[in-house]
Design a protein with these regions (language model features):
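Phosphate-binding/switch loop-helix module in NTP-utilizing enzymes
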Residues: 118-156
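The Walker A/P-loop phosphate-binding site
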Residues: 2-110, 122-132
Length: 156
């Protein structure tokens, strides 16, 4: 006869085996508007919320559909308006400063870090390094940070 499955023991073993892993739910408390009420509703179920901070959100669509405009323009601007620092990773080398300024994005070093990367491994290493440093900070000293990758498809 097989032993009964013990979820408590399984959970304990699993969370101890992977450094930095946590269990449970992490419901978002902060939201960044997409600049479009209908899209906010589709993403979050609320006309005023939009993209949840602390979660991965992917915008996919045909070339020219407006993904860069929504993400690099509207969402970055809304994040900055909320005091959130933005790391903008540009894999197409297509996001120029004049275009971002036209969208009212603040490109100063205190508000935005724009990185040009063409390899997914570089992006993974950058985010991994950031997360290690971020977790080492005292929780009340951690700034709110938004990562935007334009375009993920070019990295794959």
């Amino acid at each position: 006869m097989a032993k009964a499955f013990d979820p408590t023991k399984f959970r304990t073993q699993l969370t101890k085996s992977i450094t930095g892993m946590s269990a449970g739910f992490n419901d978002p408390t902060d939201w960044i508007s997409t600049g479009n009420y209908a899209l906010n509703y589709l993403v979050s179920g609320d006309f005023h919320k939009g993209v949840p901070l602390g979660k991965v959100t992917v915008f996919a669509g045909e070339s020219g559909a407006g993904k860069s405009y929504i993400c690099a323009g509207n969402i970055v601007k809304a994040a900055q308006d909320q005091g959130i620092f933005v790391v903008l990773i540009d894999s197409e080398n297509a996001l120029d400063e004049a275009w971002l300024h036209a969208l009212d994005v603040d490109t100063s070093e205190s508000k935005l870090l724009k990185l040009n990367m063409s390899m997914i491994d570089d992006v993974a290493k950058t985010i991994s390094t950031f997360m290690a440093d971020y977790k080492a900070m005292e929780e009340d000293e951690r700034p709110k940070v938004l990562f935007v990758i334009d375009s993920l498809g070019m990295l794959l």
